[in-house]
Amino acid sequence: MFIEANQADIDAAVAIGADIVELHTGRYCHDSVGRHDELLRLQAAAQHAASVGIECHAGHGLDYNTVSSIAAIPYIDELNIGHFLIGESIFCGLPAAIEKMRQLIDAACTSPAGANR
């Protein structure tokens, strides 16, 4: 279930029996002015999802410049980045695009912020 990163949407997903939610990261990716506040909102939402027993994914607009901070959120289990990877693959090939993204995600998950994974 694709939702906004807030407690009310997560609670509504739980109420209808959803096992997994995907937090919308578009605002974080496209609003450089409000990016820090949006990151805090995503972190809080992911933590709330974990506290109520729902698996948390994230996606929309993620690219090489925005993925690391989202990947470092300990309670996010999966990222959806297909659109960017396919577009980027036009320039460097799909294996290279995936490899670069994987390196960024792996580095973020082993950083102090993502060390709880």
Predicted feature residues:
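Alpha-helix-loop-beta-strand connector modules within alpha/beta enzyme cores
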Residues: 36-58, 101-109
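Histidine/lysine/aspartate-rich catalytic loop segments that bind and position anionic ligands
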Residues: 1-49
